[in-house]
């Protein structure tokens, strides 16, 4: 009787998402789908890091063989501080959502949130070139998408916020990028002073989660205006409901941004960017089913 040859299964590269809370995260499902689509040998898990123990959790994960990680609230700024090197997007965002452990043992940080937003906008609207864009909010979500929007060659980017000084601070920061290359495209404006129709209005605030609306004038919405809320849900967000009432040409929620930023992270780690359409449909169907 001869021995059967042993078959060894190649070890899966380990990835994870860190957050607190983390149980709601759709990242393990999304990256599991991406791995299947691209036939990449990897595992992806959600890790609940203690509020005061993110760094220890992350370093333990890497020491145990982890290759890369996503980071969600409330750890994006802590992740930024831990990185040995950073992308331009992460540097300007002041926050990191994607970490890679490099061959020399150092940690590289990137921020793919804005790249995911722009990819989803282009999927819906086509080119963003020359468009007049209003960005509502001046927090971390807004800051992470300004450089990708500018790189997409928008014609004008107006930032508005309840606390106007925060919007102006972002304008001053990003006006200095690449020797002032984008300074003539950037402007801040108080909400009551907004005038004229915009081609695109992006809500980066979390107001929709509480069913609230930023105090925006109706006049900014025309019959060719597209409105985008970074929040999402089974039903239209409060912001997108308002946009429909103003007869906006198109309303879009942030589910595509979620899938898009994940695809950019996956591509950074694996060198292949997965198609997002099938995963997006699965998530949309799951949202609807869970709401019933």
Curated annotation (Swiss-Prot):
Pathway: Metabolic intermediate biosynthesis; chorismate biosynthesis; chorismate from D-erythrose 4-phosphate and phosphoenolpyruvate: step 4/7. One of its GO terms (cellular component) is cytosol. Keywords: Amino-acid biosynthesis, Aromatic amino acid biosynthesis, NADP, Oxidoreductase. The keyword Amino-acid biosynthesis applies. This is Shikimate dehydrogenase (NADP(+)). It catalyses: shikimate + NADP(+) = 3-dehydroshikimate + NADPH + H(+). One of its GO terms (biological process) is shikimate metabolic process. Its EC number is 1.1.1.25. Involved in the biosynthesis of the chorismate, which leads to the biosynthesis of aromatic amino acids. Catalyzes the reversible NADPH linked reduction of 3-dehydroshikimate (DHSA) to yield shikimate (SA). Homodimer. It is an enzyme of class 1 (oxidoreductase). InterPro entries: Aminoacid_DH-like_N_sf, NAD(P)-bd_dom_sf, SDH_C, Shikimate_DH, Shikimate_DH-bd_N, Shikimate_DH_fam, Shikm_DH/Glu-tRNA_Rdtase. The keyword NAD does not apply. The gene is aroE. Transmembrane segments: none annotated. It comes from the Bacteria. It comes from Shewanella sp. (strain MR-7). The active site is at residue 76. It holds the Pfam family SDH_C. Belongs to the shikimate dehydrogenase family. Shikimate binds at residues 25-27, 72, 97, 113, 232. CDD domains: NAD_bind_Shikimate_DH. One of its GO terms (molecular function) is NADP binding. NADP(+) binds at residues 137-141, 161-166, 230, 254.
């Amino acid at each position: 009787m001869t021995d059967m040859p042993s078959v060894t299964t190649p070890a899966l590269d380990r990835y994870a998402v860190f957050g607190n809370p983390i149980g709601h995260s759709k990242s393990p499902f999304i990256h599991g789908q991406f791995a299947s689509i691209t036939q990449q040998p990897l595992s992806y898990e959600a890790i609940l890091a203690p509020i005061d123990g993110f760094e220890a959790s992350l370093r333990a994960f890497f020491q145990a063989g982890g290759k890369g990680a996503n980071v969600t609230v409330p750890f994006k700024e802590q992740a930024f501080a831990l990185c040995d090197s950073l992308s331009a997007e992460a540097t300007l965002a002041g926050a990191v959502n994607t970490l890679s452990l490099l061959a020399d043992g150092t940690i590289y940080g990137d921020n793919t949130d804005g790249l995911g937003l722009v990819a989803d906008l282009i999927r819906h609207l086509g080119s963003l070139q020359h468009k007049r864009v209003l960005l509502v909010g001046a927090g971390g979500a807004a800051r992470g998408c300004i450089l990708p929007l500018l790189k997409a060659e928008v014609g004008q980017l107006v930032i508005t916020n309840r606390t106007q000084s925060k919007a102006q601070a972002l304008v001053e920061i990003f006006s200095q990028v690449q020797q002032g290359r984008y300074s003539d495209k950037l402007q801040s404006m108080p909400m009551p002073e907004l005038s004229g129709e915009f081609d695109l209005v992006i809500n980066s605030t979390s107001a929709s989660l509480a069913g609230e609306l930023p105090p925006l004038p109706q006049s900014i919405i025309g019959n060719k205006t597209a409105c985008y809320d970074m929040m999402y849900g089974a039903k239209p967000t409060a912001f997108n409901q308002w946009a429909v009432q103003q007869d906006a040409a198109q309303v879009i929620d942030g589910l595509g941004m979620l899938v898009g930023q994940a695809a950019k992270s996956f591509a950074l780690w694996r060198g292949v960017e997965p198609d997002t359409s099938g995963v997006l449909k699965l998530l949309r169907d799951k949202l609807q089913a869970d709401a019933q």
